[in-house]
Amino acid sequence: MQRQEALIASLAAQPILVVVRPDPADLDGDDGPGSLLDHLSCLASVGLRHVEIGWQPDGRWCSFVDRVRQRCPSLQLGAASLLTAEALADLETCGLPFAMSPCFDPVLLERARQHGILLVPGVFSPTELQQAAAMGCGLVKLFPAVSVGVDYIQRLRAPLGPLPQVIAAGGLGVGDVDAWLMAGHAAVALGRRVIDVQGPDPTLLRWLQTTAG
């Protein structure tokens, strides 16, 4: 629970996460100008705190995580797309403090807890949200958020009662962040659209610079 509380507190300070997925060149160690690592370094320099690195069943994945950690020590790194016990094992090897899953899997969630890993489950339906709350999850990821709309969680609060804090993820851009936060979400996760071959989205850079502090 300490890791969960720490992540919730950190997201309260900066309610945004960037989700990245290294390609083969990144895994091979191509970390020069224009690389994913170079772009992450740029985001870290303007104050980004939270990055999820999409897990891959590749022995080079942990090495990439280590390089990001070394070059961008201010970033709080977690793993994205956790679906298997194999992925949990890699998470332990890398020593990452948290991971996100796109699905609600009670068996995987319990296994993560047994290994001291904070796994934030993905939820979509009212049933999944209620089950996650019953299992003691204080933080969940609504995925894909774009499919249900910004008011979805608010509409569930009356019939379901107290709910976990919610990260909105899936199909959202920088321009959506403020509306989803105002609707009561704890944070917003941004995916592939905020980093391309040209670098980080200038809108994201401005958002980070404006909210830094």
Where are the model-predicted features located?
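Histidine/lysine/aspartate-rich catalytic loop segments that bind and position anionic ligands
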Residues: 102-148
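Glycine-rich beta-to-alpha transition loops that act as phosphate-gripper elements at the mouths
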Residues: 20-24, 79-85, 101-104, 121-126, ...
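Glycine-enriched alpha-helix->loop->beta-strand junction motifs that scaffold or abut catalytic
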Residues: 44-49, 71-74, 93-99, 113-120, ...
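Shared catalytic-loop signature of beta/alpha-barrel
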Residues: 131, 147, 151-159, 163-167
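Short secondary-structure capping/turn micro-motifs that flank functional sites
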Residues: 58-60, 86, 107-108, 127-129, ...
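Conserved N-terminal beta1-alpha1 strand-loop-helix module at the mouth
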Residues: 1-95, 114, 174-175, 194-213
